[in-house]
């Protein structure tokens, strides 16, 4: 999201054990990183990005990385919203990853032109974890598809984690509620905010979409659907649902998902 002032990018870079800005970081337990074959991971959740309730879940997610995390957050989905709203996402992301004690860069990229600037593409090359927060899924898709940024996103998937919440999750399906997605999850429509009373309209939307050919991947708050190569699983506090016609499968933390359910 965009910071106040003339600078088109606001970047706060966190180091393990300290903050690379003028503010000091509070000591916290470092994330431990696994030693394993390279991952190609997608992790998406229905809601709750950067909030205290998902902190421990994100700590576990970061543990999947093969190397020390370099997290990049982008609130491009909210690019058409107010400066105040963009500042909200910016500050929330900064505080969240500061508490996780990992290196973090927040890029202010509000649209397609912003995303495809050289400094953004270079940040993508240096990162191994990119997170797209909420807003308009269609604006986010229009900002990414068929671009140099999209190419870098595919490269990042081969060495790290593409993560998203709400609109940032929806774009990774083959199709969205309205429009098409980036097709990281073929044959799938991602439905965020599943089961939340504030989004009661989603229940009717699911009924309508379930008449079509796509599998519905319904995500609850603070819970990731994780795709690691050909392995599917759940990480978090609530549930993930796969709905197709008369079938409704529910999964919770630690569950493995048969890949055929999304084929």
Regions inferred by a protein language model and the residue ranges of each:
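Short, positively charged low-complexity motifs
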Residues: 4-7, 13-24, 31-35
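C-terminal and late-domain segments of enzyme folds
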Residues: 41-67, 77, 83, 87, ...
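Class I SAM-dependent methyltransferase SAM-binding "motif I" and its flanking Rossmann-like core
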Residues: 133, 139-201
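Short, well-ordered alpha-helix to beta-strand connector turns
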Residues: 68, 101, 127, 159, ...
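Portal/gating segments that form or line small-molecule/metal binding sites
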Residues: 78-139
